[in-house]
Amino acid sequence: MQADIVSYSNATNQVIRPSITNNAGVVIQPAVIFNYATGLNMIKYGGFFQMGKRFFDNRLGINAGIRTDMNDFTTSGSNPLRTLSPRLSLSYVLADKITLNASAGVYYKLAPYTSLGFKDAAGNYVNRGADYLRSTHYVAGLEYLPSDATRFTLEGFYKRYSQVPISVKDGISLSNLGGDFNVLGNEPITTNGTGRSFGFEFFAQQKLTQRFFGVFSYTYFNSKYSNVSGVLIPSTWDNRHLLSILLGFKLPRNWELGLKFRYQGGLPNTPYNETASRLNFITLGTGILDYTRLNSERLQAFHSSDIRIDKKWNYKKVTLDLFLDITNWYLAKSPAPPFYAFRRNADNTGFQTTDGLPVNTNGSNAVPFYLNNSDAVFAPTFGFIVEF
C-alpha cells in the first residue's frame, strides 16, 4: 500500500499584448494581460502485489504483479477497478549466453495537475471527470553476453494508449503539443483520445578492458496520438531515429579521452496559418499555428558531438583529475521551428510596408517573413576533481 498528499498551485501573470501609445502618450491600444490563479489538494493512494519464481533449473523466470491507483479528487478516482493494472514478465535462458526476455502490462497515469487544477470563471474545477491515461505495453527481446565485459540486446516494443487528454478548445491531443516547452493542459479537456507507438532498440556495451570502453544504442520508433476525430497524428517527440555512441580511451601517462556522438531524426512541426497570422500579428506579436495541419511537417535531423580530455595525478592519499569538456565541439545547429514576424524597416523604427504607409492593424500592407530559430550551443568546461 502507498499514499501521498499532493498540493498544487498555479499563479500566472502573462502580458499577452503591451499597451501602445502615440507620441503624445495617449493609449491607442490597451494592454491585454492574463491573470490566473488556482490550486488543489488531493490524496493519491493505491496498492500493489508482486511475486516471482524460477523453474526448470532456473532457466525460466516468471514475475507477475497487479496494481491499482486511486485519488480523492477526480469523479471516479476512488474506484480501484478503474485502474486495475496486471503485469507479467518472463525470462528464459535459451543457451549459455543467450536469454529471451518478454513482458506485458497495463499502466495508468493521472491527468496533468495543470488540467485537474483548471477552474472556470465561476471557480469550478471543470476537469474532475478526467480519467487516468491508460497504456498497455508489450516488449520482447534477446540478450547476448559473449563475455563478462560485452553485452548485446535487441528489443522490440508496442504500446497502445487510451483515455488520452484532448484539448476541448483545439480538438487536439495534449501529447501532440509541447515542443516549445509551454505549460500544457491549463484548459478544459476530455480524456477520450487514443495513441500508439512501436519500434525496436539495439544496444551494445563494451566495459572497460585494457584501454577501451564503448556504448552503442540505436532506437527506431513511431509514435502517434489521435485528435478529437480519432485521426492519428505524429506526436511532438516522434523523432523516428535515435542514435547514441559513447567511446572512451585510456592513454599512456594517465591521460583519458572520451567522445560522445548523438543523432536524432527531425521532429514534427506545425506550420503557421498565414492568413490568421497576418491578421493578428500586430495584436498578438506572434504567428498563429495551423492546427488543421498539426505536425504535418518535419524539422531537419540533428547531430552533435562532445569531447572530454582528462589528466590524472595519483598521490599516496589523493588523486587529482584535471579535465576539459567541450559540448558540441563542431558547432552543430539544433533545428527549431521558425518565428513568424513582420519585417522591420532599415532604421528599425517601425515595420516595413508594401505602400510606405504605417502598418495596418490587420497587417494587410506588412511584409511577413520567418525568423530562423536554429542555433548552435557551444559549451567548453574546464575543471578539476579531487578524490581522497
Model-derived regions, located:
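Outer-membrane beta-barrel transmembrane domain signature of Gram-negative proteins
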Residues: M1-G61, P188-F198, F369, N373
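Transmembrane beta-barrel strands of outer-membrane/channel proteins
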Residues: M1-S7, G47, A64-M70, A102-V106, ...
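Outer membrane beta-barrel strand-and-loop segments of large Gram-negative receptors
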Residues: Q29-M42, N127-D131, R151-V215, L242, ...
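Surface-exposed extracellular loop regions of Gram-negative outer-membrane beta-barrel proteins
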Residues: G39-T75, T83-R87, D96-Y138, Y158-V183, F203-N222, K260-L284, A336
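Gram-negative outer-membrane beta-barrel transporters
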Residues: F55-D57, Y158-R160, F181-N273
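Repeated loop/turn-to-beta-strand initiation elements of outer-membrane beta-barrel proteins
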Residues: N58-I62, K97-L100, D148-F152, R211-G214, ...
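C-terminal beta-signal and adjacent terminal beta-strands/loops
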Residues: S162, G214, Y263-G285, Q300-S304, ...
